[in-house]
Amino acid sequence: MKLEQRIFFLICLVINSFSNCSLLVAPDGYYNIYRENKIENILNLKPNGNKSQDSYYPDVCSKAVKNKEGVKSFILSSFPLSTKEYANVIVTKGSHMTLGDGEYHQIFNINRFLNIVCVEGSLVFSTKDVVYMSALVILPGGNFECIDCTIKFRDLYPTNSLIDPFGFLPGIITLGGSLSLLGKQKTVYSAVLIDENILEVQDISSLDIFNGYSLFIFSESFPLGKASTFTFNSNQIKVLEIKIPKTDKSIRVFFYSRFSTFSTSTTASIHITGNSNVHIENFYIDSFGRTTNDQYSDTELIFSQDDPNLITGFINGSNQRFRSSLYIEHSNNVTIKNSVILENRGETRSPLIFFGSNVNISGNIISSKSGSSLIAQYGTENIQSTNNYYSLSLPLLKSLNSTLDSMDYGNEGNGIFSISPKINSINDIFNGQIIAINHIILSDRSSITGFDKDCYSPCYNDSIRVSSKVQHSVEFKITGSTFISSSNYSESSFLFRISETGSKQSSFYKIINSNLSYPISVLLENNAFILDNVYGFGNFTINGLIKRLDIINSTLDPSVTSSISLSNFSKAISIQNSFMDYRSFQKQNNQIYGSIITPYLYYFENTMNLIKVSKMYPNVNHQILAGTVLNMGIEIIIIAPLFGKMDCIFEDESGIQTIPFNKSSNSCVLPYLFKNEGSFNVRVTLSLTKSLDNIIFQVYFPMVTVFNIYSFYSGWAMIDSNIEKEIIIDGNIFKKGCQQQVLGNCTISTNSKLITGLPSVTESDKLNRLFSSGITSINPYEPVTITIPIDKESKKNQIQLFFTHQPIDIETSLLSIYVENQPIFLLEPLQSNLDSTFKNLTFHYENSKSLEKIKITFITRGDIYLTSTAIYSSTNQPIYNEVIGINEQLNILAIVLPITISLFAAASILAGYLVIKKYKKPNMYYNRNTNGNIGMKVFSTKFKRRPKKVIPLSIPLSTNRITKKSLQSLDSMAENPVILLSIPELEKANEPEFNPEKTFLQESELLDLPTPKVEPEEPRINIVPLPRFPTVYKKEDNDKLLKELNITGPITSENIESFFEVDVGLPSLIIKNESEIILQEIDYIETGEIQEMEGSFLEDKSTDTTVIVTKSDGLPKFFQTKVFSKRFNDISKFDNDFFDLKEYIVEHQEESFEIPFMTSEDEVDETKINIIDFLLSPKSNKVALNMYLKSFQNRNHKLCYGKYGSNKNSILVIEGTSYYYDCTDVRLPISTPRSNLNFGITDGNKCIVDRKYRERLQYINVYSEPFRIYTLFPDSNDNVTITTSECCKEIDPFGSLDVDIFVTLKTTTKFNEKVTIRYETDDKELAFSTFVYLNLESQVSSKIDFDEIVLEKYLSEGSFGVVYSAIWRSSSVAVKLFKHHYSKDEIDKETSILSKIKHPNIVSFIGSLNFLNTYGIVIDYHPRGSLNYYTRNQNIKLSMVQNIRISLDISRACSFLHKNGIIHRDLKPDNVLIVSFDPDSSICAKISDFGTCREINGKHELNSKAGTTRYMSPEILEGLPYTYSTDVYSFAILFFELLSGRVPFREIPKREIPRFVRLGTRPRLDQDVFADNDISLILLACWNPNPRGRPTFDTLIDLLEKLLKKYKERAKRNKKNQNQ
């Protein structure tokens, strides 16, 4: 084969396995072109239309000269070259060539003619001499490394007459190999301006600055960088040629050398595709990029009409897209770190473009004169940008005459332009842009990209019930990033702009955990926008138009509050637990009923430094009967002492009531009597006097709607009128007969569909019948309208709408409701976590026009079904309808009380002296959550009054209108009156102020209303009889046994037990000894009814019985001899490795290995010899980690080699058969249509952890005699549970058999396993075997597969267990394995706390694991280790600035914990991890070890001692409960140790420390460092013996920030004095 043919063959067949790759013959003078349909194959998408998906590359390597075989050096003599002036060379596959420093004189000759370098093998440049070339092409499998090397690109030699029509060259093309550009030293640094030509730069002592370096400065005044010479003294640099304006605050410097550089003297580009590996670090890419900021104009091909592979001409484009400094597509293994990309040759589109690649870049300078600093094209779903400096000099901005189809974006002057990813920007600097982050939503991209199902983020399969393209909600995180907008632009600039393209699909878009000081623009006319945990200050404001705005857990400064006119751009607003300025806040008038306006309004800017509102009740919209008392109140946190008396002034439309503030409970509660019907807006004002002149806070309560008793007027059930009967509940008739017609009492719009057989969502059969059918839209997001009669005589009506949510996926589904075209609820979120749930929406309707019928419209994506409606009239007597008979008795439909979903907690009807005691808190429904439901199922609760608890008689009550019948449950015939509730299970994540276990209402004011949870129905148990067998068999009875059990071959120790375990028709066998076999007497097995699961065969609703396939708990004793263990475990190399280890231990007992094992060589208990026993004793078992690593590949053959696993006993099933690899082989007697089973998960989707999936395996007997089928499934284990309906079955001649397989993946894992199948006739003359392959991969979850963990290094050991560093899915992590004495509850507590808290100064929780009954957690790994190492190591001395900064980070972490109701309880240097010693870095320290942490609630006091005695507070040593002040004391001891370098209480015996601390002893402040009053006062305050006298961590943060600033300034002065 010719070389060019071989190269083309590789390109077409190796690069990404392209199926449609062909060589196109170009006209003379041009390179031939190869064409590939890469996108369809890589993205697993199918074309949807006539759009071309082809990409073209020049065939530049086909005539390259290959190297001589076996040569190592990339020099002239390594290639059979003539004395040409230019040459194209190729490093062939298998060759490893280098270019080093000592080969310069030979390189010089090559430089004169080196043109194109192709790499198919390996090529490493480590020379410090400049290498000139025109093009570098890395072919599939090729590897190119440039280590501290410099390459300069120039035009292709003119003597080479061939032209690249697509403009790739000069430059680099990487087509599926590996590209590494590495500099040995960091050259990018942050700088602080000391004077106009003096810069302070930290941590540059290791950089040999005078060794050929020049200085580039990037700042507000120099967006494209400014070069200068400099002088250097310590960490200060004096700039000689330029002066830096004092207004420049964000400065980066780059020390440029001629090493580690790619530069070009012409227009060039770097193009990376084909799933290439890219690592660019400490490198400089200079002057690349040729795509301008004008409209794209791509080169087009003209093909011959006779030959589709013949190009007859070109239409040359003037501006080929994606020829940038760095273009990366379909390559997810990309690292770009601490590098500089400078694109200043002209006005370009963008220096950095990603296409179908997830992005993680950090510490870079990206500078250009372009339309955007970074562009993320479709397929790039996530951007993680950290500490990057995006610097832009605005080009001449032009409007593009382009459409969406052209995908011509990003020319507007952006920092990051994105059309699809989720963006996380941390500590980035955007300098000179008009828009820092510009995000355009293309919710359905199919019409643009030409791909089927190309919707935003991964598309899910269409539901059985709903055909819909599904979107994820979208999250943006902007934390600590700075935006310096262009001063040369007159129009508005935005930190963030998000807009949609007119899609009718509604979704959530969120900015979370961000500090925003710049304007944002939001154009989401059909969507909801959420600010979650956002601090808005400075110039922050919101412009645009949205349908719904939610402000959650956020704080807005006064200037921000005044600039946000809420009612101008949002139709519905929800403000929860958020602080806004009173004088600037404008309450929305005529709010939509579903909105919640509950801001905490502060009066002065420093208010929140003194006092904060912690909670309020009610905290959701409330509905209540007239004449009922409702306890309304707030609770606050006092941060600093307040002088004078404080009052709580409650007021509404009817008047004002004032009560004194209760200092003991830090609350004020008012029993509020609502006498009249209507809607009431109550607010409470906290004032230092009874006057409103000294207001501190003002809080609006949610709307309280008061109504009189209503009569049931009409009810309608969405049921099939031809089959179902009308439904009567408590005498109230729910009529059938709603039809798609114009006339009639109840009509439905024609764009709806009726779905029957909805799953049960309540405990009541009656109610389930009412909710068993429902209507929804045929097409997603189309409004469905139902017209129903209403009492025209009643002005006030109450309407109940009952919905069943049958979710498509785990994403939030949105519901909007309109009555007579007026919005009632807008984009209310429903999330059911794949379980069907019941939702009730109840609201008032004012029939002011005396209508006889009303139109109710609802809009969903198609997975929410309206099942029934009920209308209540306020007239004295119900109005009868000529079609429907109405019960005359007063009846409130007690299905549920009025509740608004998702944002509304349940409110019970308060009858007589009933006052609610407990309330649930609203859920952060925006957060994705796999456990909690937004709404619980309906249940009934009997009304029980707490004994001896009464309401004061001074509160008037009204009970005369409530009857026993009106409160009776619809699904209970109990004599006692009951109230039926529907309480949404609303856990409010990230909101510590709402704690359901801690209420501030007084016990004397409460009545108990128990609310039992609904548990899923237990499966029915079927008893299946089995044949009886004799109890004992002797060896001589083996043949008889074999005959009875239809087993071939002798019963041996290798096969007997495991074989029977998987056979449903056989009892379990245990071999007692070598002469007896005992058969357990089992008369039945349990098989549970399995509910219908999602999969390929969901339409089959038959009930299946299953048998759980489980792994054996242990081998019988006969199997436990050393000889057998070796032989038995030959099947399992993993176990074999550890038996080898066991032998090693026996032979080396003098090393005292501390692992449990039997000393007798004749009997070994396998259950006690496993990997955990070794890994949990690493100090005494030196070989443990090595043996673990040795066994890793054997345990993970699927991960390491891509192979399938199988049951270790498969060899026993296959033995003695005719084996066929493919189960669809026509030579087999049993036909199996499919060899690969994917459980209905296709198109690259992944299954959900802990969800059961079903697949059906079908057998068809094509022979005229019966066969018996034995099926051996993989063992269930910690990662997967596999069950099946059949393991052993006979199939009749020409008959068929269906076997259902159920698989549940319990962790984040890949399940690629073989099912072993054996077919045999009764006489055993014909026996065949084959495999069926199971394929399933789970989505990423918090449960981790231990088999994917690669332990690398032992780190530490404690009483809890052992910590290792490890690799998990290419990420460095730390794995904490708990010792066996730790209970699962203790571990679950730590895991629960870690999973809830997300903060930069708290170690990040990645997941938990369970392996061989040993639990562990996985967290992020920080190689610098714990603070304890540095405080106890006398050879290491941290500076004061470093010590204070570390203490500040600890305080920030503890403040966050306390705000979330968590006490750490074990704060000490061991539990502080060091991230960086640079005080100016974003993170210096993180706290860890949450095994002793506890969440505080109102019922349980934390009395149990936890932590380390040396750091325990005196009140804990005295046995008093833990409080937040406990951590403050521990911090003081830690802070002392950090500053002094001494172990606290080192002079006191450890056992005596508690006694001395209780007596008031504290560490001595006798060192110079404590002469600073600012430091000593902090310590004295923090270890105050009175916990109430200790400051909060918020106060400490302020003090430490001031202290840090002081010592930084002192350090600068000292350095300046030293330099002088």
UniProtKB/Swiss-Prot annotation:
Disulfide bonds: none annotated. The keyword Iron does not apply. It catalyses: L-seryl-[protein] + ATP = O-phospho-L-seryl-[protein] + ADP + H(+); L-threonyl-[protein] + ATP = O-phospho-L-threonyl-[protein] + ADP + H(+). InterPro entries: GDT_regulator (IPR052015), Kinase-like_dom_sf (IPR011009), Prot_kinase_dom (IPR000719), Ser-Thr/Tyr_kinase_cat_dom (IPR001245), Ser/Thr_kinase_AS (IPR008271), STKINASEGDT (IPR026237). It comes from the Eukaryota. It is found in: Membrane. It is a single-pass type I membrane protein. Residues 1349-1604 form the Protein kinase domain. Residues 913-1620 are cytoplasmic. GO terms for cellular component: membrane. The active site is at D1466. Keywords: ATP-binding, Kinase, Membrane, Nucleotide-binding, Serine/threonine-protein kinase, Signal, Transferase, Transmembrane, Transmembrane helix. GO terms for biological process: regulation of developmental process. ATP binds at L1355, S1356, E1357, G1358, S1359, F1360, G1361, V1362, V1363, K1376. In the N-terminal section; belongs to the GDT family. PANTHER family: GROWTH-DIFFERENTIATION TRANSITION PROTEIN 5-RELATED. This is Probable serine/threonine-protein kinase gdt4. It comes from Dictyostelium discoideum. The lineage of its organism: Eukaryota, Amoebozoa, Evosea, Eumycetozoa, Dictyostelia.
